[in-house]
Amino acid sequence: MSAVEWSILPGLSPYRETLEAMENRVAAIRAGEAAEAIWLLEHPPLYTAGTSARPEDLVEPERFPVHVAGRGGQYTYHGPGQRVAYVMLDLDRRGRDVRRFVTALEDWVIATLAEFNVRGERREGRVGVWVVRPDRPAGLDGSPREDKIAAIGVKLRRWVSFHGLSINLEPDLTHFEGIVPCGIREHGVTSLVDLGLPVTMQDLDAALLRTFPQHFPD
């Protein structure tokens, strides 16, 4: 099975049930019983803790439900207005290179943002995608402000990937205040709408679909 099956889920997907369904799909892919899959969805407001999450980075533990995700990375927020892409690909077939896979995810996000004339950038030592904010005050050292627009956190099970990435379209950015996103205190978060772009979720999904084959060819 080589074609990737795409699903766009309506409404808000409950986290625990979605994680269980994702784990079942990963097992089916590994067994050769199901095609690779990408699920595009939104969650209700919640925080997830990756395998490197530090207790002190959960600033407001009572604000939203907190889930242990089992993916790589630290704390992140999911909620309405944020597009989550769960990426279930067979790296045994595509190449057993985790670093290359994460880089391809970043490149996919960067290409998607470019569809809206947004320059997303990667940073050494900071997984995810960032945008420079010349419209915001510079840092104490005079360096330009950088805000995170997309987070990436993955897990592999017998070389099938799951979890994936999230892109901030129009979430309530104050919801990120309950955590230190990805353990990075000196940078903020942004979204496409925060950048002044009237992008819809349908626009974003279409861009994700268009740019995917460039970075994950069959």
UniProtKB/Swiss-Prot annotation:
> Any one cellular component term from GO for this entry?
cytoplasm
Q: Which UniProt keywords apply?
A: Acyltransferase, Cytoplasm, Transferase
Kindly give the CDD domains that the UniProt entry links to this protein: LipB (cd16444)
Pfam families, alphabetically? Answer: LplA-B_cat (PF21948)
Site (Lowers pKa of active site Cys) found at 148
Q: What is its EC number?
A: 2.3.1.181
**Major localization listed first in the record, in broad terms:** cytoplasm
Say which domain of life the source belongs to.
Answer: Bacteria
Residue ranges occupied by any BPL/LPL catalytic domain in the UniProt entry: 32-218
InterPro entries reported in the protein's UniProt record: aa-tRNA-synth_II/BPL/LPL, BPL_LPL_catalytic, Octanoyltransferase, Octanoyltransferase_CS
What the entry lists under Gene3D superfamilies is as follows: Bira Bifunctional Protein, Domain 2 (3.30.930.10)
Give TM segment ranges: none
Keyword Lyase among UniProt keywords = no
| Keyword Cytoplasm (UniProt) | yes
Please describe what this protein does: Catalyzes the transfer of endogenously produced octanoic acid from octanoyl-acyl-carrier-protein onto the lipoyl domains of lipoate-dependent enzymes. Lipoyl-ACP can also act as a substrate although octanoyl-ACP is likely to be the physiological substrate.
Q: Which family does it belong to?
A: Belongs to the LipB family.
Q: Which HAMAP family match?
A: LipB
Q: What is this protein called?
A: Octanoyltransferase
Species of the source: Cereibacter sphaeroides (strain ATCC 17029 / ATH 2.4.9)
| Highest classification ranks of the organism | Bacteria, Pseudomonadati, Pseudomonadota, Alphaproteobacteria, Rhodobacterales
